[in-house]
């Protein structure tokens, strides 16, 4: 398992000049609010779902790879109750890339403020959970939801495995769970995924292979960025 004590610098060949027929293939890896904010900015340079041209001289083709270690709030409850991947970060990324910035996006972000069993859940999380139950495939549920929201790009969970983030702190103590790691005041010595050896989706590896640009973050280094890099084959 790679140590998280040092941060590697990723380098890649300078991409070829953007042409009208060749968009810049961008793969954005991360999670949390940082990734969704980045995607909202990139969206303006992505062609519409019906082929509408972009404004300006640049066009990008967007793939988002989203961490699936969240275990707090609505996502954590759904993980524990339904044994599914946490939907929250993926939901936020879908809304960020959606062409619909009106009622439908507001609906997916709506969070229930009352109701036994409903309080704290967002509609979009419940929608993804229901589609996962229907299809039996979380990645397929994400694709179907993305079509409904008419997103400008593709979104993949970093792995289809239901993994737990663990950290070894500087004092040697082990902490399990993203939410507990975030609350820890001790320096982090190393980060792990359990079970180890989880694999990414085939589509994720294909997107990385053809990428002109790969972005990491912005977001929490240990809980939003590095967990993706612990999945075998990413990047």
Question: Model segments located where?
Answer:
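Glycine-rich nucleotide/cofactor/substrate-binding loop typically near the N-terminus or early
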Residues: 55-138, 147-149, 154
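Conserved catalytic alpha/beta core of Sir2/sirtuin-type deacylases, generalized to analogous enzyme cores
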Residues: 2-26, 33-64, 126-215, 220-235
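Short polar catalytic/cofactor-binding loops
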Residues: 31-34, 69-70
